[in-house]
Amino acid sequence: SPSIFSTITSTGGGGGGGAGATNARSGGSGGGAAGGIPCGGTVGAGNTPSVSPPQGSPGGQGAGTAPAGGGGGAIDPGSAGAPGTAGAGGDGATNNIDGSSTDRAGGGSGSNGTGTGNGSNPFGGGGTGSGVPGTAGTTNKGGGGGGAYTPYNGGAGGSGIVIIRYKFQ
């Protein structure tokens, strides 16, 4: 879900694809598409709604015979799933606007259907994929949710965050 302050909106990450939603959800960082028969849906688009500078990248593609694709991150898109290998989530971005170095908006990994997602990407709050339902992205970090292999559901995207910094005189 997005976080809004006045006219500033920080879009949350997109959810990963899965049996309950073959097509991944779009967001600041797009979700990765599901893998496994009969899935292989469409990826989530990044930077949705479109703003400049962009808030994220698209997810990676899954396929009917391959594991799920990874979710897009702030910096890079998610990678596609391949036989035996889940797609990695795209890299998030680091900033220190709140006084400490924090990673945000990483893409969630895909699932290989038999265990943990090979492409786990904790960088920036992306959810990990697994042989069970995908994990949600971290709250207030805008990470994409982990993708899932049929018959499980993908994880929800993490909510965005708006941080206001000003100098008091």
Give residue ranges: language-model regions.
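Low-complexity, glycine/proline-biased repetitive segments and flexible coils/loops
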Residues: 1-169
